[in-house]
């Protein structure tokens, strides 16, 4: 199913920067593993009319949507029927605070490519991204009926020439 999203994104005109469809995994025995593997995929120039924008893809596929202004970007995100997660790359702390406090999604990344929180934060979205009733008893019931938001941020030191990292944080400098 995820490969179908990648195929659809290409067909609809998104710019495919990293193609994970032909990933080959070498097993412990040194031979190619048998199985179904899909590598990271990165699209640029994704637009709201594309299926890869409209649907949640639970696989290693990331789409970049460009907006001319912060209000335009926020309007696109808030109008979307799902509210799982979104990211903003900026050097403007005021814009980051404004964005993270007002955007209507459950997980926000500031200067991180994936707004996936560590285990003690909420993992989940708002709107149609939240399904099920698994948290309806005891202390989880309070959390279930409360809109929670996780904001993950990274602020490189001024003048830091390192390129943006698109991987999970590590202990390496």
List the model feature ranges, each with a label:
Residues 28-173:
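Conserved C-terminal structural/oligomerization subdomain of aldehyde/semialdehyde dehydrogenase
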Residues 16-28:
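Cytochrome P450 fold signature focused on the C-terminal beta-domain
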């Amino acid at each position: 199913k995820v490969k179908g999203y990648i195929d659809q994104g290409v067909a609809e005109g998104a710019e495919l920067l990293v193609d994970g469809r032909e990933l080959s995994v070498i097993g412990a025995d040194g031979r190619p593993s048998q199985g179904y593997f899909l590598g990271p995929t990165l699209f640029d120039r994704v637009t709201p009319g594309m299926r890869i924008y409209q649907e949640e893809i639970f696989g290693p596929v990331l789409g970049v949507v460009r907006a001319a202004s912060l209000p335009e970007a926020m309007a696109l995100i808030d109008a979307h029927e799902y509210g799982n997660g979104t990211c903003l790359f900026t050097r403007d702390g005021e814009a980051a605070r404004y964005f993270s406090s007002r955007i209507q999604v459950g997980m926000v990344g500031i200067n991180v490519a994936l707004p996936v929180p560590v285990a003690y934060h909420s993992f989940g979205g708002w709107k149609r991204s939240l399904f099920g009733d698994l948290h309806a008893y005891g202390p989880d019931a309070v959390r279930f009926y409360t809109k929670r938001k996780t904001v993950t941020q990274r602020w490189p030191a001024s003048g830091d020439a390192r390129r943006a990292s698109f991987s999970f944080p590590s202990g390496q400098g």
